């Protein structure tokens, strides 16, 4: 049991406690749906808002106790998704990945390689689009003939994933994807 925090930078203003205890039901629902890919985000958000009306939600155990009835057959995986959503919101992780990717063409020399490991689909999606199309969101650039222009040559057509041996030794590696692209 720990205090709801989840900040990677302890001096950052926003903590998980702030999100859980100050966000509106709609804001919580968006966080859980967008970053946790939780289908019943509306019900979970309503339960959090109802619970905090009497007392603030201070610890991870308190939040787990509120979320557990909504987990269904997913159990611990559901709780992991709830806390993943909070962590991503608190640390603005997707924005950090996107900002990093946008800077890479300027700092990487021609022939330089971009190697990125992602651990879940929300991280992998912008990486995949960037190395495949040269953009994170929106339409990729096209040349005069309608061909896609991308400043990257894929070194790995598909992401490199952990082998069964690796996942046995290191269970956390099961979701890791490694993508490699070369600046052209």
What are these regions (language model features)?
Residues 1-184:
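S-adenosyl-L-methionine-dependent methyltransferase catalytic core, i.e., the SAM/SAH-binding region
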